[in-house]
Amino acid sequence: MVLGMLVVLALSAPADAAYGPDLQSASVATSADETAIRKVIGDYAKAIETKDLELFKTVKPNLTLEEEKRARSAFASIQSQVVKITFLSIDMKEHQAVVKVTRRDTINGSIPGAFPQTFTMNKGRTGWVIAEIGR
């Protein structure tokens, strides 16, 4: 009976509640900058999930032509993708931040596994943006 209720609750939860980025850390109160950084990373995940190249360019405005080409190719080859981001650390120094996460994608219904990602971010006049994405 309990197992049945858990299955129903899991299935009735909104998709972004189950797979969206962990925008708030339960253990530490976040600063306005940390909250903004987490939102940008969340928008990055949303851009991938929704195949929204314009949103991708908003969070990573220095996107190169090669990166754009790879993104278009990936978006075209994947039917569905859910991106789960788990924040490991946010190291801020003035107008730069290094954000370490674990990312787990569900691609076309399959979970190929989790992998680390490191984002180098810059804060400009319009707020935080992704400068580099690495592993």
Label every model-predicted segment.
Residues G20, V28-V98:
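Short solvent-exposed beta->alpha transition segments
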Residues M92-R135:
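Exposed beta-sheet edge and beta->alpha loop/turn motif
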Residues S12-A13, I37, T120-N122:
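Intrinsically disordered, low-complexity regions enriched in Ser/Pro/Gly/Gln/His and often acidic
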Residues M1-S31, V98:
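Juxtamembrane and targeting peptides
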